[in-house]
Every structure is written in C-alpha cells, then in structure tokens.
C-alpha cells in the first residue's frame, strides 16, 4: 500500500486526514497544501462511495471515520447525515472522480505549494 507520510506519525496522519475529510464534507471546498490534498482525495472518494452504497454497514464504516460535527445549523444535520443524504445522492450516476484539485501559488510563510480541493 502506497501513501504519503506527510511528516507525521501514523496516528497524527490518520487524525489529520479525518479532520480534513470531515471539513471537506461540511464545506465542500477547502484550501490546503498540495500533498495533503492529493492524499485527502483518495480518502474522500472512499467515503463518498460508502455514502452511495447507503446500507447500514456502510453508514457504520463511515461513522467510524468521520468526525461528529454539525454541518448545517438550520436542520441540525451532522457531517455523516450530509454525506449520505446530500452528497451521495448528488453523485449517484457518477463512477468515481468526485473531487477536483486546483493548484494555487506558494504559501507566503514557508513557500509550500497550496491547492484547493473541492467536490465536483
């Protein structure tokens, strides 16, 4: 299995990817470094595929990974509910390729290449 280390221990890396995945599901567009965006893409694609499956086991697998954060204040919807009700239905006909990565310029502080990752 090939993945990027991202300069972190395995637990730190998993926690960071869980946070970024939850943020992308809630906001549908985030700005991060290019390598984080490329690593995040595979995780988010798997979560959306679980959402499209829609059965109880898929929901429990996604719930084990996605953080329990409120996605929508008006209807009190959390990130998991948004994944299964809004995002999964949007990509029902699409076979993969749910995200887009657009490169930005370098970050001002340290010159790290930045990118925007968003749901298509």
Curated annotation (Swiss-Prot):
Disulfide bonds: none annotated. PROSITE patterns: RIBOSOMAL_L17. SUPFAM superfamilies: Prokaryotic ribosomal protein L17. One of its GO terms (molecular function) is structural constituent of ribosome. GO terms for biological process: translation. GO terms for cellular component: cytosolic large ribosomal subunit. Keywords: Ribonucleoprotein, Ribosomal protein. HAMAP family: Ribosomal_bL17. Belongs to the bacterial ribosomal protein bL17 family. Part of the 50S ribosomal subunit. Contacts protein L32. This is Large ribosomal subunit protein bL17. It comes from Bacillus velezensis (strain DSM 23117 / BGSC 10A6 / LMG 26770 / FZB42) (Bacillus amyloliquefaciens subsp. plantarum).
